[in-house]
Regions:
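Acidic, glycine-anchored loop motifs typical of Ca2+
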Residues: 462-463, 515-525
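Beta-propeller fold recognition
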Residues: 19-432
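Solvent-exposed loop segments of extracellular immunoglobulin-like
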Residues: 449-456, 531, 535-551
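A short beta-strand segment in extracellular, disulfide-stabilized domains
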Residues: 439-448, 522-535
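Short beta-strand segments of immunoglobulin-like
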Residues: 431-437, 512-519
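Extracellular/lumenal mature domains of secreted and surface-exposed proteins
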Residues: 424-507
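Surface-exposed, flexible coil segments in extracellular/virion-facing regions
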Residues: 454-473, 541, 550-568
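Bacterial Sec-dependent N-terminal signal peptides
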Residues: 1-24, 321-323, 427-428, 437, ...
């Protein structure tokens, strides 16, 4: 053995900065919960804050200190004072194009580079009686004859629906309008996006599924907003210039029929917090307009958050009604709801579709699954709409995940099927640092999904500070240090910290020479370098260091071309 390289990489997750944007949840019939990230408490909202009534779709957003900014049911937008914004009031004819009966009627995405502007993406309910009337205003019967009321469920225009399937659209909220309470910008309101073939009338009459999710782009300066229709995924990029209206389209299994799309379009879509996966639930794949079927499914895909392309479809659940889906904070587990069960899938298993665990079973319908800023997953359970079930340790397998029914009491209001979705990357805030040894440059960076104006680092050793986004610092003594980062965005200042351990430089001790003999004279000799590892590390903790072997000093210096073990 001639060459040895020891390499250590540390990634420390923190609770702060990005997660705080998901601090306020408003959903159901006057229900809501608030996360206090400083104390770790979760409380139900009071009666004065109960200003929403939606059975499914909803979305909310806070600033990076956890202060409420606004929330929506996809039609109305309420400001931080719980008042409907003037240019987003459905009953007054100024509403948005979502629907409270759409699975994900709204999703709020910050406009990169502008802390005062947010996009509200809306997805309408694709109603078959609007499709029957297309291109005219619904409702209509199956023969296209106009009717006064909807029959499934009962309702009328304009009180319950505008008579059109509006598909995916977006509107811009400017928080500087309306005396600083925010309002929708008229020139960027209800901008419809193309998620269908305009040459196919039936596609155009439905336009889009009730599904929408968002995740950070690999450049960390923009987002992907993703939806689905029939057998296509549509990924729209949002950057500092606005919404790119030409999507990245991935045509991939399964094919969901438009024949029963009123029900076929139901179900959640979620991106994993690390941006590597997309999971989607299809409530059913029936062929009767407005009819029910039991042939639902859940699928998971690899996602390239550089290109926006999905690949490698894997069917996890078949022939069962599916509704909610959510990833664990570390993206290693997937949870699904529907058909009276909540299931957990181990995505690290060789065959994830075979590695599942039933966490909950009920005679009613389990609704949305939503990851919270406290790292727990909250579950809408129709059996008791005055509370939420909680998965307390979603990174853990099986019973260790800690499923607890009725854990989160809703002191006012009740839940429906929906809970507010967020940009999944909000739940992946972290300080990253490489090289935690004495007399070696330790490289720091902060993973943030929101633009900021400045950052001030304090490395905790009483020496210097830095205002660089990705600074390096050299510690001269081993020990435990508290590193803090003070981030300024506009007038808001947020400080968070993390404890790191700086170790003495690792020592690669020379192991004994290895004598190898080609006993069977076949020209192949095996080298087992695992056994000498004890000699290489000596008294150093093998759980803290990785030993790798290389054919050249250059490879060792660049930590490339590590030999696989055993080596032949």
């Amino acid at each position: 053995m001639k060459n040895l390289f020891i390499y250590a990489l540390f990634l420390v997750s923190i609770l702060g900065f990005s997660q705080a944007e998901a601090s306020h949840w408003y959903f159901g019939d006057g229900a809501g919960i608030i996360f206090d990230l400083e104390t770790g408490t979760v409380t139900s909202t009071n009666a004065a804050q109960n200003t929403i009534d939606t059975f499914e779709g909803c979305s909310s957003i806070s600033d990076f200190n956890g202060n409420l900014l606004f929330y929506t049911d996809g039609r109305n937008v309420w400001d931080k004072n719980y008042s409907i914004m003037p240019n987003a009031n459905y009953s007054l004819g100024t509403g948005l194009m979502g629907d409270p009966s759409s699975t994900s009627s709204g999703l709020i995405v910050p406009k990169p580079g502008n802390p005062n502007e947010y996009y509200v993406f809306t997805v309408d309910e694709p109603h078959h009686q609007n499709s029957f009337a297309f291109p005219n205003q619904g409702p209509a019967d199956e023969f296209g004859i106009s009717t006064e009321f909807y029959t499934n469920p009962f309702g009328s225009v304009p009180e319950d629906d505008d008579g059109f399937n509006n598909g995916l659209a977006y509107s811009l909220v400017d928080l500087t309008l309306n005396n600083g309470n925010g309002d929708v910008v008229t020139s960027e309101k209800n901008i419809q996006l193309l998620t269908y073939n305009p040459n196919e009338q039936e596609e155009e009459s439905y336009k889009c599924a009730e599904k929408i999710t968002a995740v950070e782009h690999s450049d960390k300066q923009s987002y992907w907003v993703i939806t689905h229709f029939i057998d296509n995924f549509y990924a729209f990029r949002v950057d500092s210039n606005g919404v790119e209206t030409t999507p990245v389209i991935t045509n991939i299994n399964p094919l969901i029929s438009t024949s029963g799309y009123r029900r076929n379009g139901i179900g959640y879509i979620k991106a994993s917090p690390d941006g590597s996966k997309i999971a989607i639930c299809h409530s059913q794949n029936g062929n009767q307009a407005g009819g029910d079927s039991d042939n639902g499914s859940t699928w998971i895909y690899d996602f390239d958050n550089s290109s926006g392309i999905l690949s490698n479809p894997l069917n996890l659940v078949s022939n069962v009604s599916q509704y909610g889906v959510e990833f664990s904070p570390d993206s290693s587990k997937l949870y699904t709801s529907g058909g009276g069960t909540v299931l957990q899938f181990d995505l690290d298993a060789v065959n994830p579709e075979l590695s599942f665990f039933e966490l909950a079973f009920g005679f009613s319908f389990f609704g949305a699954l939503q990851l919270g800023p406290d790292g727990k997953i909250y579950v809408a359970n129709n059996e008791d709409p005055f509370s939420l079930d909680v998965i307390n340790f979603p990174n853990e397998l099986g019973v260790d995940a800690g499923y607890n029914a009725y854990q989160m009491n809703l002191s006012s209001g009740s839940s429906g099927l929906g809970l507010p979705p967020f940009i999944q990357s909000f739940f992946l805030a972290s300080i990253q640092f490489e090289n935690s040894c004495v007399d070696i440059n330790t490289e720091f960076s902060v993973n943030s999904t929101q633009a900021y104006d400045s950052i001030l680092w304090d490395f905790g050793d009483g020496t210097d500070t830095s205002t660089e986004n990705a600074p390096s610092h050299t510690y001269t003594s081993a020990g435990t240090y508290t590193v803090s980062a003070e981030i300024t965005a506009g007038t808001e200042v947020s400080t968070f910290s993390e404890t790191i351990i700086i170790s003495s430089n690792p020592i690669a001790n020379l192991a004994d020479d290895i004598d190898i003999c080609d006993d069977d004279n076949d020209g192949v000799m095996s080298f087992d370098f695992v056994a000498p590892q004890t000699q290489v590390l000596a008294e150093q903790d093998p759980t803290e260091f990785t030993v790798s072997y290389h054919l050249s000093q250059d490879d060792a210096d660049t930590n490339s071309g590590a030999l696989s073990l055993p080596y032949q």
